[in-house]
A protein has these predicted regions:
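Active-site core segments that coordinate phosphate-bearing ligands/cofactors
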Residues: 1-154, 162-171
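Small/polar loops that bind or transfer phosphate-bearing groups
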Residues: 158
Length: 171
């Protein structure tokens, strides 16, 4: 039976990225990269949990607490206008797990890793979105390595599909 050439991303506050398989996949590689198996009806989802739009949601909350209220569309627009790849963060770094001032967290991560420190809302959001898209790329490459085959299609579902900029970066 031919194996599908696609994977999925369930995109929202958190992201799940993986493939559907007939049997669970258990290997040293899967363990090393922190993949898991979830049983479903007639299949198993072999996947990895990834930070999602939590980064942007928490930045938005921090700005709102400072009296600057942005819609997600406004934040995406500002990010689209910002210069690309001014800095990158690992979205799964423990710095970003707890609620709080995510703007300060992103800036602190950039300072700690000796990168450009984002200096505007647009740059902060662009750093978050580009970093998330590159994390998706990293997970895709690990999936292909573990499966031993190329995955040429990504199906994205969930509330995160409303963020067209993230979807474009992911493509």
């Amino acid at each position: 039976q031919p194996q599908p050439n696609w994977c999925y991303i369930s995109s929202g506050t958190w992201s799940l990225m993986g493939v559907e398989l007939a049997q669970p996949l258990v290997s040293d590689q899967a363990l090393a990269y922190n993949f898991t198996n979830e049983g479903g009806v007639g299949s198993y989802r072999f996947l990895k949990n990834i930070m999602g739009l939590w980064l942007v949601q928490e930045c938005r909350r921090a700005w709102r607490l400072q009296g600057r209220d942005f819609s997600y569309a406004q934040l995406s627009g500002l990010a689209e206008e910002a210069a690309p790849f001014s800095a990158l963060v690992d979205p799964d770094d423990e710095t970003f797990l707890a609620p709080g001032d995510m703007v300060a967290g992103i800036r602190a991560y950039c300072r700690r890793t000796e990168q450009h420190i984002p200096d505007s809302e647009g740059v902060v959001v662009r750093v978050a979105l580009e970093s998330l898209a590159l994390k998706y790329r990293w997970v895709l490459e690990r999936l292909e390595e573990i499966l031993g085959r190329r995955l040429s299609v990504i199906h994205i579902v969930g509330g995160g599909i409303q963020n067209e900029l993230l979807c474009q970066f992911t493509a």
